[in-house]
């Protein structure tokens, strides 16, 4: 019995590890584009608006695929959909390093969003399936640790690679390693018994969620969450380099430390939510702090104070990720985990599309990021209002 128990624990650990390994490549391409944007803009001759559309195109196709990806994962098997998502994402990361002009880059990133959705939805459900119901927010938060590990690596190693080999090399090298990781998962990865025994969903089950006011409230908060997250993540390097005059290496160090703070804070938020059984309290506190720090980022000129604000903002920007994804599963059940996360992430990526494009367009119009950061701070206050509404709905 002890040997069987030990074997089950080892099997669980291996599966969690290979899923997180593959998840680490999900946003490498987007993080690299944001970090090396000045070099990419110069080489491909892009305006700020065009640069913003590279991120917006990925987010738009990613958003449209959220519910279909969740449904496909629940209907046809998490392992199969996850492998397709990882392989497609990493292959397109590699080929982004080969694009000769803007339109090629735009098509590449649009296609990338489709595979990102498959990777994210299946990966989120795979991790959740290896944890019990009492640790659901922690499990869902764990998925971001893998994602941010990839961002941390490209932000830490990328500037050195760009300096010695040019901006294309990080995409080619990370993409190649990611393709290898996808086949490691294919060889070692398994689905838990929970996922293998689940009832297959119908399309009508997924579409029926649009009738539920509870899901619309969660969706609006998701819109704010990723809108603010992606708006800051994509444009912060440009803010530091173009408006604050920091060097690429210094900016890379700041972004890497910021990423290093996000991953554990996300886990901590999920843990606190699970222990206290107060997910909306975690969400509300996070949104208040984000509103204040995001607004302050637009006005502060002192570099030391700006860096402190960036780090405080980073601690709370995904602090409520796990609780927000866990609340719908708490209400509707684990058999719909992929579809529920797809619904929430559809709204989340509409927010990300809105703010990445909006900040680029406002930068072109005004020459500064100030108005864009104020808009994100206002969105945080809107999210706070809907969090209060969500708590009332949970109580009843």
Question: Language-model segments: which ranges?
Answer:
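Conserved MFS/SLC helix-loop-helix module at the cytosolic interface between two early adjacent transmembrane helices
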Residues: 64-103
């Amino acid at each position: 019995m002890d040997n069987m128990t030990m074997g089950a624990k080892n099997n669980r650990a291996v599966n969690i590890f290979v899923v997180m390994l593959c998840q680490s490549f999900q946003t490498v391409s987007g993080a690299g584009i944001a970090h090396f944007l000045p070099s990419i803009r110069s080489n491909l001759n892009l305006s700020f608006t065009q640069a913003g559309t590279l991120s917006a195109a990925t987010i738009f196709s990613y958003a449209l695929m959220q519910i279909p990806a969740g449904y496909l994962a629940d209907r046809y098997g998490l392992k199969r959909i996850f492998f397709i998502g990882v392989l497609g994402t990493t292959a397109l990361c590699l080929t982004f390093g080969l694009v000769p002009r803007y339109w090629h880059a735009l098509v590449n990133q649009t296609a990338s969003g489709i595979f990102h959705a498959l990777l994210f939805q299946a990966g989120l459900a795979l991790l959740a399936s290896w944890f019990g119901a009492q640790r659901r927010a922690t499990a869902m938060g764990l998925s971001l640790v893998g994602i941010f590990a990839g961002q941390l690596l490209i932000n830490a190693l990328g500037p050195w690679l760009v300096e010695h080999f040019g901006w294309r090399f990080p995409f080619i090298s990370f993409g190649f390693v990611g393709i290898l990781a996808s086949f490691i998962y294919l060889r070692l990865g398994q689905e838990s018994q929970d996922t293998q025994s689940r009832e297959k969903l119908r399309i009508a089950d997924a579409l029926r969620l649009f009738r539920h006011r509870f899901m619309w409230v969660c969706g609006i908060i998701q819109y704010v969450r990723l809108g603010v997250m992606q708006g800051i993540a994509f444009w912060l390097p440009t803010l530091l380099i173009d408006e604050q005059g920091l060097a690429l290496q210094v900016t890379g160090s700041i972004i890497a430390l910021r990423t290093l703070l996000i991953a554990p804070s996300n886990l901590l938020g999920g843990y606190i939510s699970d222990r206290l059984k107060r997910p909306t309290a975690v969400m509300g506190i996070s949104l208040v702090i984000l509103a204040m720090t995001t607004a302050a980022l637009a006005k502060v000129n002192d570099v030391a104070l700006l860096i402190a604000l960036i780090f405080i903002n980073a601690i709370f920007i995904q602090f409520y990720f796990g609780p927000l994804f866990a609340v719908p599963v708490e209400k509707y059940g684990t058999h719909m985990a992929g579809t529920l996360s797809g619904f929430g992430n559809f709204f989340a990526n509409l927010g990300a599309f809105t703010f990445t494009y909006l900040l680029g367009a406002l930068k072109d119009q005004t020459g500064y990021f100030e108005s864009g950061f104020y808009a994100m701070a206002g969105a945080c206050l809107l999210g706070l209002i809907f969090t209060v509404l969500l708590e009332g709905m949970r109580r009843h």
